[in-house]
Amino acid sequence: MDRTTLPYGLFGLDIDPYKEFGATVELLSFLPSDFFPSVRDLLDTASALYRESLESSDHCSPHHTALRQAILCWVELMTLATWVGNNLEDPASRDLVVNYVNTNMGLKIRQLLWFHISCLTFGRETVLEYLVSFGVWIRTPPAYRPPNAPILSTLPETTVVRRRGRSPRRRTPSPRRRRSPSPRRRRSQSRESQC
């Protein structure tokens, strides 16, 4: 998926839809195109897991917003493809347009949907760590890498995310009293659970 240069006098504007989330188009490009499930499967997953929050008028997270936008873009692309299929007389031209939409735009939408669903499901840091791990794995010559690629769903159990900066102080464990959450905390947790 290449970066998009915008028309209408905005040439040279560098848009990367993953930048604000700490990733890049290049980082996602390490994953092969057949890695991403079909748009239909991704839409079914998004609907099954996040339907209520996606349909809500509340702002839940930037990932929910991006997911909504990707879904709306796909709906518009399918509307265009249907229109082209019904109105373009030349079958060869019609097939070229429909195939281009399905192949190129379909891959971009599949990447966007996968990224945001995965961030909502596993957490952004875990997904970024996975992308880096996979990128390192795929660029390592086969003779020097493990036979199996990293798996996102097992990543939190098998890797240690190292953060930059000082290492945290070590403290000896001390017994602590368990405190009940304050009403404010309880309210914020219930709101987060909706999203």
Swiss-Prot record:
Keyword Phosphoprotein attached: yes
One GO cellular component, as annotated: host cell cytoplasm
Pfam annotation, one family: Hepatitis_core
Keyword field contains RNA-binding: yes
Gene Ontology biological process terms from the UniProt entry: microtubule-dependent intracellular transport of viral material towards nucleus; symbiont entry into host cell; viral penetration into host nucleus
Principal location: virion
Region annotation RNA binding: where it falls in the sequence: 189-195
Short motif (Bipartite nuclear localization signal): ranges: 170-187
Keywords for this protein: Capsid protein, Cytoplasmic inwards viral transport, DNA-binding, Host cytoplasm, Host-virus interaction, Microtubular inwards viral transport, Phosphoprotein, Repeat, RNA-binding, T=4 icosahedral capsid protein, Viral penetration into host nucleus, Virion, Virus entry into host cell
Subunit structure: Homodimerizes, then multimerizes. Interacts with cytosol exposed regions of viral L glycoprotein present in the reticulum-to-Golgi compartment. Interacts with human FLNB. Phosphorylated form interacts with host importin alpha; this interaction depends on the exposure of the NLS, which itself depends upon genome maturation and/or phosphorylation of the capsid protein. Interacts with host NUP153.
The name this protein goes by in its record: Capsid protein
Record gene name: C
